[in-house]
Amino acid sequence: MYPAHLLVLLAVCVSLLGAASVPPQPLNLVQFGYLIQCANHGSRATWHYMDYGCYCGAGGSGTPVDDLDRCCKIHDDCYGDAEKKGCSPKMLAYDYYCGENGPYCKNIKKECQRFVCDCDVKAAKCFAGAPYNDANWNIDTTKHCQ
């Protein structure tokens, strides 16, 4: 085998090992990202909401810093209510569609799927209606969220 082939093979193996250590994104959070894009008509990338204020992103504490952060707190609380019902909101897939007026849940008969879809649609529409303040992205939560 030629040295160049060995290098390519090694690079592929290392890439696969690295990819194997990345946990898969829960399906519902991917869908939620699509709902956000639908609601805001693609005006802001989903990742802008992943580290915003005290509640947008992982965890949450304190008082929301603005209306958008309040949307995230409401969404977090809604997921908490879903968990109390025995649902797994971050893992549930559901049917939805993107219409001219934003996202909607399709005809969902299973209670958990309907509940979680409603949480996500309400939050996505709330995000679209709330102003985005760049100063509240990636804030020091130890100072602002107690």
UniProtKB/Swiss-Prot annotation:
Endpoints of the signal sequence: 1-19
Disulfide bond annotation, renumbered to this chain: 38-98, 54-145, 56-72, 71-126, 78-119, 87-112, 105-117
Domain of life: Eukaryota
Main subcellular location of this protein, as a coarse class: secreted
Catalytic residue list: 75, 120
A single MF term (Gene Ontology): phospholipid binding
Pfam families to which the protein is assigned, alphabetical: Phospholip_A2_1
Residues reported in the UniProt entry to bind Ca(2+): 55, 57, 59, 76
EC number: 3.1.1.4
Keyword Transcription: no
Sorted UniProt keywords: Calcium, Disulfide bond, Hemostasis impairing toxin, Hydrolase, Lipid degradation, Lipid metabolism, Metal-binding, Platelet aggregation inhibiting toxin, Secreted, Signal, Toxin
Subcellular location(s) per record: Secreted
Enzyme kind, highest EC tier: hydrolase
Catalytic activities: a 1,2-diacyl-sn-glycero-3-phosphocholine + H2O = a 1-acyl-sn-glycero-3-phosphocholine + a fatty acid + H(+)
GO CC terms of this entry: extracellular region
InterPro entries, A to Z: PLipase_A2, PLipase_A2_Asp_AS, PLipase_A2_dom, PLipase_A2_dom_sf, PLipase_A2_His_AS
Proregion positions: 20-27
Annotated tissue distribution: Expressed by the venom gland.
Cofactor binding note of this UniProt entry: Binds 1 Ca(2+) ion.
Cofactor: Ca(2+)
Entry-linked Gene3D superfamilies: Phospholipase A2 domain (1.20.90.10)
GO biological process, one term: arachidonate secretion
Family: Belongs to the phospholipase A2 family. Group I subfamily. D49 sub-subfamily.
Task of the protein: Snake venom phospholipase A2 (PLA2) that inhibits collagen-induced platelet aggregation. PLA2 catalyzes the calcium-dependent hydrolysis of the 2-acyl groups in 3-sn-phosphoglycerides.
Protein's UniProt name: Phospholipase A2 147
Organism: Drysdalia coronoides (White-lipped snake)
